[in-house]
């Protein structure tokens, strides 16, 4: 045996192969406290399956997708401006898991997911996000945008728009699914959305939208929800309206906007975020004029909690990795978890991790009561 091979025996294992549900006793206790027994009997086997995927196939796919980020192809071979985005097959397989097998985008909007006769309560959605993110972080942004976009559409869109778009937005068949994106940010309008400059002008039964959106995640989604200012609207956030912009027009042609480039990001590398220029893009008003900020704020609580869940999930993954090393790394004749200073460091990780878990479990539970 070579010296290099012998040295490898000293390296502690990582979380590969771990079931993130099975090892999380805090999560299991919270589920028992907040979910009724009949619902637990339905969802816990699925949570266990996702937990196993999180430390297995999903983790493998995530690593591959991060090494092979999406690629923008501005034109086709004939010179047509199509701005197609090429995703690695690993990303497409993760989409199949999230949208297809686990229906994470729609479980709170349709009956029958996993055989449960009602739409799932919000807490179930957040638990699935928590387990999924421990294996893959980037894709949960598009999944969450689809979920909150469905909430907005169901509450605010006209019956005509609902009939046209909701069936495919609610699908879990990847050949039928229309994914959702939300284009809000501009160069001068990040947190201060009142600075939005993208303009919309009425044209018959639709609107034509012009301007630049600066940070557009899930840039090649089939359905886009965006904020724009109509002609003559007041300045600031009170003059913003919400529009649905389809990727393709009714005649099958591409809508009039361009994905100018993709962002070179430090994180969420698997998911395509881009800069978009709208040049007379066809859009449809959602709700009443000048109520866009009110509409989007109604989904902000969902998004905020989702971001908290993602943070809790990453904290848990980091804790799992630390525990795995501490329990298996041997120094001075014993596993380093036996050393008091190591235990102290682990406790400094463990306490806020359990607090984050407890926070989102409680908040997700009372969200159903608030609704």
Residue map of PLM features:
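Extended, charge-enriched "interface" segments that sit outside catalytic cores
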Residues: 1-117
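N-terminal leader/propeptide and maturation segments of large enzyme subunits in energy/redox metabolism
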Residues: 35-58, 117, 123, 140-163, ...
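Internal helix-loop-helix
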Residues: 83-176, 217-219, 357
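A glycine-rich, basic-preceded beta-loop-alpha segment at the flavin cofactor/substrate interface
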Residues: 117, 251-256, 260, 272-303, ...
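Internal maturation/activation junctions in enzymes
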Residues: 157-198, 202-205, 361-371
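Short Gly/Pro-enriched turn/cap motifs at secondary-structure boundaries
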Residues: 188-191, 215-217, 234, 265-271
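A short core secondary-structure module
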Residues: 206, 210-254
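Extended amphipathic alpha-helical segments enriched in small hydrophobics
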Residues: 304-370
């Amino acid at each position: 045996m070579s010296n290099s091979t012998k040295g490898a025996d000293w390296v502690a294992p990582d979380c590969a192969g771990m079931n993130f549900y099975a090892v999380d006793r805090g999560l299991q206790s919270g589920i028992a406290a907040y979910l009724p027994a009949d619902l637990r009997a339905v969802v816990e086997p699925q949570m266990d399956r996702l937990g196993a995927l999180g430390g297995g196939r999903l983790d493998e796919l995530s690593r591959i997708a991060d090494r092979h980020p999406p690629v923008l192809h501005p034109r086709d071979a004939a010179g047509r401006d199509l701005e197609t985005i090429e995703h690695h097959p690993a990303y497409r397989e993760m989409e199949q898991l999230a949208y297809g097998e686990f229906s994470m985008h729609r479980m709170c909007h349709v009956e029958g997911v996993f055989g449960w006769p009602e739409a799932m309560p919000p807490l179930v959605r957040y638990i699935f996000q928590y387990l999924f993110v421990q294996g893959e972080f980037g894709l949960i942004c598009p999944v969450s945008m689809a979920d909150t976009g469905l909430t907005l559409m169901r509450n605010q869109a006209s019956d005509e728009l609902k009939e046209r778009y909701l069936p495919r937005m609610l699908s879990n068949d990847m050949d039928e699914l229309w994914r959702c994106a939300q284009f809000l940010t501009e160069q001068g309008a990040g947190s201060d959305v009142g600075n939005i400059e993208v303009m919309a002008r009425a044209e018959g039964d639709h609107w034509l939208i012009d301007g630049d959106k600066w940070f557009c995640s899930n840039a090649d989604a089939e359905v886009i929800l965006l904020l724009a200012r109509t002609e003559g609207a007041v300045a600031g956030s009170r003059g913003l309206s919400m529009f649905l912009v389809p990727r393709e027009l009714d005649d099958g042609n591409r809508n009039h906007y361009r994905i100018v480039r993709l962002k070179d990001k430090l994180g969420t590398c698997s998911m395509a975020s881009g800069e978009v220029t709208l040049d007379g893009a066809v859009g449809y008003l959602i709700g009443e004029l000048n109520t866009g900020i009110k509409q989007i704020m109604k989904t902000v609580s969902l998004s905020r909690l989702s971001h908290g869940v993602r943070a809790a999930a990453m904290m848990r993954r980091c804790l799992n990795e630390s525990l795995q090393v501490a329990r298996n790394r041997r120094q001075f004749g014993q596993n380093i978890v036996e050393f008091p200073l190591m235990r102290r460091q682990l406790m400094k990780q463990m306490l806020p991790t359990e607090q984050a878990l407890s926070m989102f479990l409680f908040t997700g539970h009372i969200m159903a009561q608030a609704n």
